[in-house]
Amino acid sequence: MKKLPIFLTALSILTSTVSLTGCSKTVKPGDVQGYDEGEQYISMWVHTIEDTPEGEAYKESVERFNEKYDGTYFADIEFIPRNDSGGGYSDKINASVMSGDLPDVITVDGPNISAYAANGIIQPLAELSEEEKSAYLDSILDQGTIDDKLYALGAMESSVGLYYNKAILEEAGIEVPDKDHPWTFSEFLDILEQLKPIMDSKNGYPLDMTFPVGESSIYYYAPFIWSNGGDLISEDGLTADGYFNSDKNAAVFQYFRGLVENKYMSATPIENLFESGRAAFKFDGAWEVNTIYQSYSDIDLGVAPYIVSDNWNGGRYTPTGSWAYAATTKTEHIEAATELVKWMSGVDSGILLYENTKSMPSTYAAYDQITTFEEDENYKALYEQLRDYGHPRPKTPVYPQVSTSFQQVLEDVGLSGKDVQTEMDQSVERINAKLERYTR
């Protein structure tokens, strides 16, 4: 992605041209408890409340950093939670971009890293050695790398499972394939058809699937596009035409329409359909495992390999992405900021965050040290899927528009039966209109 002028775009980024220079507050030794003479001060903002399991993990990781680097660095964390609409934290960043009051390090939601980099909000990290980089999952490095430069490292990772009810599949005589031989789209349709009489008798559906407004739809279902050889945006992130509206993508959106038409899924959301035993399958985030274990222990849960196109070439395609740490363009101490980013995304911090929230770590060593990812078949399946097949969401400065457009086409074609080419072409017009400022 080429270097772009500082234009701030939708969702977490403003629409006006701004300057990153300004009068930020100077913090002196003694102003903050623990910050002593001779230490490099590093300010950091995170997107959550302090008094939560996630916030407590971040706070403890910072305390451990300050203990390890006592006399060299001092990290000062500030908690700026998001509100229900996703603002709050991003609003604070927007205002601080304009005033020049950004901290040295911020958390960035993974899909927005490209936009923050393109708009000059974050800068490349100081050089990491190959050994340091090899500690991280490929998906973490891929998500954080723009134009061959590493901008961010994940606080955590994520994945989406194709969950199944073991008792229902056993009743139907269906065997689940191994992770390297997932069901194809065609095979999955045959399985759903086989399950339909059983689920009809339970007043349910073979598949618990919805197309929710917001980030979930592209996060859950973009793999259908990727395994079919499609993309939603060009490699440089600057055009959607010929990508979002391709024949390959049209076939995928029509596939979703078929799921609705054949009544393999409900056209309207049904709360706890899978959890109540009235669906055989469900696509959901890794958090679903803990939800089932804690609240629906009567469900014998399994994780099947995420399904693939009949034309899948064996490449990466499964969902990834979560919050990451990045150094802002405000910082004049990139080496210090990078040390904090490495610490907060590293093994010990990842284990601590898992212990508090059950989120998936960013480093291989963290998985090796957390026995759950070896001993629990469901968590193990999610990790292996992430490790072997994880694919980042589209990298583009207008990612929010791509995400919104994907959900709109899913809903309009899948649920309402509108013409797929018309809906895709209209989405391309909207996406490319947002991209014009980056291609002038």
Where are these regions (language model features)?
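Hinge/lid segment of periplasmic solute-binding proteins
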Residues: V108-G161, S186, I191, D200-N203, ...
